[in-house]
Amino acid sequence: MQRECYRFGGVTFAIEADAPIERSRMCAPFHAADGAPEHTIRLHFDDGLPVPPETAQHRGAVWRWQSGMERHLLEQYGTPDKPPQFTYAVTRGAHTEVTFANAYRAGASVRAVLEAAGIFDIFAERGMLVLHCAYIVTVAGEAILFSGPSGVGKSTQAALW
């Protein structure tokens, strides 16, 4: 079994999988020594597409719902006439089970596993807020954050300071 540990925002995540997972260059600076993680993500592959309940929140290709103490996140891609393409995560406390459709077995990456697990939701449950930002540090030592979606000019604005 492959096991990789990564540390983000003071939280160590262990990713475990029976199949190889590609390391992501974007995640490389956060790679951590194997140790006791605060959260474990276990990846497996299966083409059994979960059926969200009618009460699930649905936006585009994403469904979210709670079932008791479990948080569910389903992202479905593709069309019904092709093999299933989806990621599905169930989080119970400090453990997340992630299922990728078999179509993703080749090329599954650390970054894709973290995103499928709903890492931002995991942080939110710990009282942490994640912002997509560019930043500068002023001469006085103050930080200025430019937050917003990709492509709106955060880095461009930061470069003008």
Feature map (PLM): residue ranges:
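P-loop (Walker A) phosphate-binding loop of NTP-binding proteins
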Residues: 149
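A noncatalytic interaction/capping subdomain that flanks phosphate/NTP-handling catalytic cores
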Residues: 1-145, 160
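Hydrophobic positions on the alpha1 helix immediately C-terminal to the Walker A/P-loop
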Residues: 157
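Conserved glycine(s) of the Walker
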Residues: 152-153
